[in-house]
Amino acid sequence: MSRIIGRKGINYIHRLNSASFTSVSASSIEKGQNRVIDASLTLIRERAKLKGELVRLLGGAKASTSLLGVPLGHNSSFLQGPAFAPPRIREAIWCGSTNSATEEGKELKDPRVLTDVGDVPVQEIRDCGVDDDRLMNVISESVKLVMEEEPLRPLVLGGDHSISYPVVRAVSEKLGGPVDILHLDAHPDIYDCFEGNKYSHASSFARIMEGGYARRLLQVGIRSINQEGREQGKRFGVEQYEMRTFSKDRPMLENLKLGEGVKGVYISIDVDCLDPAFAPGVSHIEPGGLSFRDVLNILHNLQADVVGADVVEFNPQRDTVDGMTAMVAAKLVRELAAKISK
């Protein structure tokens, strides 16, 4: 089903051709696609330039977090609601029920801590028949546009977990070398090619590791893993910390030091790393997960230069009426912004 939906844009173009545009050549369609992609990148480029200039004029920031939304859900193997997450997370970040300071006292209203460059228009691009190979390149290029405007660093709002591959690829290529990755998730997302989709949200870290974009990959919160997940972990030298041993691993995981000898550390948080008691609004509910304070302890105590991050797999269509998981995702974003900015 996901592969059929994944080709929706291409099928849409085919229907147009058969119905009323039979004389439109493939090259003309490609030129049109290129115009849409160029326009999409131009908007992100100009917004990043504006936000970067603002932060530089204010001065005093060595690193500043900039939000980039990637509302992509078609690579999910189950539900596609994560495509609707970025606006809900933004709404929750600025919800009047809480203040705009992080736990460590950083003020989110200060552009040196947090800016926003908008969303990659995923559905608009796909509606023009753009395939996933090109779409992944657009996402990577968008991340690089943010990073070109120093001191901005990307904090990406998913979307399903397939977005981590093009984002990490962009961060690694832009910095000129691999990073260490701290990945919090109920699942390892390291299938070689899940259900025939190499870009599946269940395969993102296989693409990252085989591309050489990460030196170390630490996966924390794992509690849904099969034989292939373990074999792939061994193949790539992944450090997998399962929930069944978390009480034993906790002292080490709450005092991590990462990134020495590489270009920095990337943090990827799948909201389903949390126990569903804390975050019910996810596509793949897995009981027995981390508490929210477990996650914050890991983040707050981490010794690292965090060069990028993502928060993925929040599904607003499964959230509670009062938007509890949206607030949870927003809190993760707020604390990640504090960790990145300096």
From Swiss-Prot:
<keyword id="KW-0378">Hydrolase</keyword>
<dbReference type="GO" id="GO:0004053">
    <property type="term" value="F:arginase activity"/>
</dbReference>
<feature type="binding site">
    <location>
        <position position="270"/>
    </location>
    <ligand>
        <name>Mn(2+) 2</name>
    </ligand>
</feature>
<dbReference type="InterPro" id="IPR006035">
    <property type="entry name" value="Ureohydrolase"/>
</dbReference>
<dbReference type="Pfam" id="PF00491">
    <property type="entry name" value="Arginase"/>
</dbReference>
<feature type="binding site">
    <location>
        <position position="77"/>
    </location>
    <ligand>
        <name>L-ornithine</name>
    </ligand>
</feature>
<comment type="similarity">
    <text>Belongs to the arginase family.</text>
</comment>
<feature type="binding site">
    <location>
        <begin position="195"/>
        <end position="197"/>
    </location>
    <ligand>
        <name>substrate</name>
    </ligand>
</feature>
<comment type="pathway">
    <text>Nitrogen metabolism; urea cycle; L-ornithine and urea from L-arginine: step 1/1.</text>
</comment>
<dbReference type="InterPro" id="IPR020855">
    <property type="entry name" value="Ureohydrolase_Mn_BS"/>
</dbReference>
<comment type="subunit">
    <text>Forms homohexamers.</text>
</comment>
<keyword id="KW-0056">Arginine metabolism</keyword>
<dbReference type="GO" id="GO:0034214">
    <property type="term" value="P:protein hexamerization"/>
</dbReference>
<feature type="binding site">
    <location>
        <position position="272"/>
    </location>
    <ligand>
        <name>Mn(2+) 2</name>
    </ligand>
</feature>
<dbReference type="InterPro" id="IPR023696">
    <property type="entry name" value="Ureohydrolase_dom_sf"/>
</dbReference>
<feature type="binding site">
    <location>
        <position position="161"/>
    </location>
    <ligand>
        <name>Mn(2+) 1</name>
    </ligand>
</feature>
<dbReference type="GO" id="GO:0008783">
    <property type="term" value="F:agmatinase activity"/>
</dbReference>
<dbReference type="GO" id="GO:0050897">
    <property type="term" value="F:cobalt ion binding"/>
</dbReference>
<dbReference type="GO" id="GO:0000287">
    <property type="term" value="F:magnesium ion binding"/>
</dbReference>
<keyword id="KW-0496">Mitochondrion</keyword>
<comment type="pathway">
    <text>Amine and polyamine biosynthesis; putrescine biosynthesis via agmatine pathway; putrescine from agmatine: step 1/1.</text>
</comment>
<feature type="binding site">
    <location>
        <position position="224"/>
    </location>
    <ligand>
        <name>L-ornithine</name>
    </ligand>
</feature>
<dbReference type="GO" id="GO:0005829">
    <property type="term" value="C:cytosol"/>
</dbReference>
<feature type="transit peptide" description="Mitochondrion">
    <location>
        <begin position="1"/>
        <end position="22"/>
    </location>
</feature>
<dbReference type="GO" id="GO:0000050">
    <property type="term" value="P:urea cycle"/>
</dbReference>
<feature type="binding site">
    <location>
        <position position="270"/>
    </location>
    <ligand>
        <name>Mn(2+) 1</name>
    </ligand>
</feature>
<protein>
    <recommendedName>
        <fullName>Arginase 1, mitochondrial</fullName>
        <ecNumber>3.5.3.1</ecNumber>
        <ecNumber>3.5.3.11</ecNumber>
    </recommendedName>
</protein>
<dbReference type="GO" id="GO:0006527">
    <property type="term" value="P:arginine catabolic process"/>
</dbReference>
<feature type="binding site">
    <location>
        <position position="313"/>
    </location>
    <ligand>
        <name>substrate</name>
    </ligand>
</feature>
<keyword id="KW-0809">Transit peptide</keyword>
<dbReference type="GO" id="GO:0005739">
    <property type="term" value="C:mitochondrion"/>
</dbReference>
<feature type="binding site">
    <location>
        <position position="189"/>
    </location>
    <ligand>
        <name>Mn(2+) 1</name>
    </ligand>
</feature>
<dbReference type="GO" id="GO:0033389">
    <property type="term" value="P:putrescine biosynthetic process from arginine, via agmatine"/>
</dbReference>
<keyword id="KW-0464">Manganese</keyword>
<comment type="function">
    <text>Catalyzes the hydrolysis of L-arginine to urea and L-ornithine. The latter can be utilized in the urea cycle or as a precursor for the synthesis of both polyamines and proline. Possesses agmatinase activity. Catalyzes the formation of putrescine from agmatine.</text>
</comment>
<feature type="binding site">
    <location>
        <position position="185"/>
    </location>
    <ligand>
        <name>Mn(2+) 2</name>
    </ligand>
</feature>
<feature type="binding site">
    <location>
        <begin position="96"/>
        <end position="99"/>
    </location>
    <ligand>
        <name>L-ornithine</name>
    </ligand>
</feature>
<feature type="binding site">
    <location>
        <position position="187"/>
    </location>
    <ligand>
        <name>Mn(2+) 2</name>
    </ligand>
</feature>
<keyword id="KW-0479">Metal-binding</keyword>
<feature type="binding site">
    <location>
        <begin position="189"/>
        <end position="191"/>
    </location>
    <ligand>
        <name>L-ornithine</name>
    </ligand>
</feature>
<keyword id="KW-0661">Putrescine biosynthesis</keyword>
<feature type="binding site">
    <location>
        <position position="185"/>
    </location>
    <ligand>
        <name>Mn(2+) 1</name>
    </ligand>
</feature>
